[in-house]
């Protein structure tokens, strides 16, 4: 049993690996956490994590630069139905396409476009940076027993774009930043968070623990 964190030149790999290792240690049978650029290791993994920071097009280019990586992701997640966790731009890459400066194809696991957030208040600046609560949209095992809502724990966001999903059923939670912002998506065995769980302290560790325990 292993968890593969994909290294494609984007993402807080060290922070993500440490957070997943810490969450894994709390489990009865911890799964080894592996940071890898090897598509074969991704294909053999029991769970896959795709972090990402920066521009959508740059992150997609980084994935494409590793021969066989996109195929390995599709076969592992879509065909073999292994649990997948996309973080920040890693979550955005689950969309049909990104529209950050240029239109770029995503993995097309969740129908929708990645578009710029548009707060309806002038005092709210872009990027959306800092702590925010989550409003649940539908139940999901990865969100089970997490304190959500206006009095819940906070998650840490740093982003200017979000995934505007075509189907409401693919949205698990939203944040409010002068309007609704997609915070968590989920479909089949894949989930994604716009915020950074590895920077979200107790809330983030609880979420990662739920993902590691999840048996879809």
UniProtKB/Swiss-Prot annotation:
The keyword Chloroplast does not apply. It catalyses: 5-[(5-phospho-1-deoxy-D-ribulos-1-ylimino)methylamino]-1-(5-phospho-beta-D-ribosyl)imidazole-4-carboxamide + L-glutamine = D-erythro-1-(imidazol-4-yl)glycerol 3-phosphate + 5-amino-1-(5-phospho-beta-D-ribosyl)imidazole-4-carboxamide + L-glutamate + H(+); L-glutamine + H2O = L-glutamate + NH4(+). GO terms for cellular component: cytoplasm. One of its GO terms (biological process) is L-histidine biosynthetic process. Pathway: Amino-acid biosynthesis; L-histidine biosynthesis; L-histidine from 5-phospho-alpha-D-ribose 1-diphosphate: step 5/9. It is found in: Cytoplasm. PROSITE patterns: GATASE_TYPE_1. The keyword Cytoplasm applies. Its EC number is 4.3.2.10, 3.5.1.2. GO terms for molecular function: glutaminase activity; imidazoleglycerol-phosphate synthase activity; lyase activity. It comes from the Bacteria. The active site is at residues 88, 196, 198. Keywords: Amino-acid biosynthesis, Cytoplasm, Glutamine amidotransferase, Histidine biosynthesis, Hydrolase, Lyase. Residues 2-216 form the Glutamine amidotransferase type-1 domain. IGPS catalyzes the conversion of PRFAR and glutamine to IGP, AICAR and glutamate. The HisH subunit catalyzes the hydrolysis of glutamine to glutamate and ammonia as part of the synthesis of IGP and AICAR. The resulting ammonia molecule is channeled to the active site of HisF. NCBIfam families: IMP_synth_hisH. Heterodimer of HisH and HisF. This is Imidazole glycerol phosphate synthase subunit HisH. The gene is hisH.
């Amino acid at each position: 049993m292993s968890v593969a964190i994909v290294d494609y030149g984007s993402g807080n790999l060290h922070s993500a690996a440490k957070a997943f290792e810490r969450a894994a240690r709390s489990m009865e049978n911890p799964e080894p956490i592996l940071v890898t650029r090897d598509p074969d290791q991704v294909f053999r993994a029991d769970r896959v994590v795709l972090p990402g920071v920066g521009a959508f097009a740059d992150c997609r280019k980084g994935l494409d630069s590793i021969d066989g990586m996109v195929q390995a992701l599709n076969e592992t997640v879509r065909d073999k139905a292994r649990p997948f966790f996309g973080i920040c731009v890693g979550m955005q890459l689950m969309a049909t396409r990104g529209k950050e400066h240029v239109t770029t194809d995503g993995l097309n696991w969740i129908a929708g476009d990645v578009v710029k957030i548009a707060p309806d208040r002038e005092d709210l600046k872009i990027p959306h940076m800092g702590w925010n609560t989550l409003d649940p949209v539908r139940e999901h095992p990865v969100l089970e027993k997490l304190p959500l809502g206006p009095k819940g724990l906070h998650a840490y966001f740093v982003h200017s774009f979000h995934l505007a999903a075509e189907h409401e059923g693919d949205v698990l939670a939203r944040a409010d930043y002068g309007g609704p912002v997609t915070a968590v998506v989920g479909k089949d065995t894949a989930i994604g968070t716009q915020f950074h769980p590895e920077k979200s302290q107790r809330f983030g560790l609880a979420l990662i623990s739920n993902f590691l325990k999840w048996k879809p």
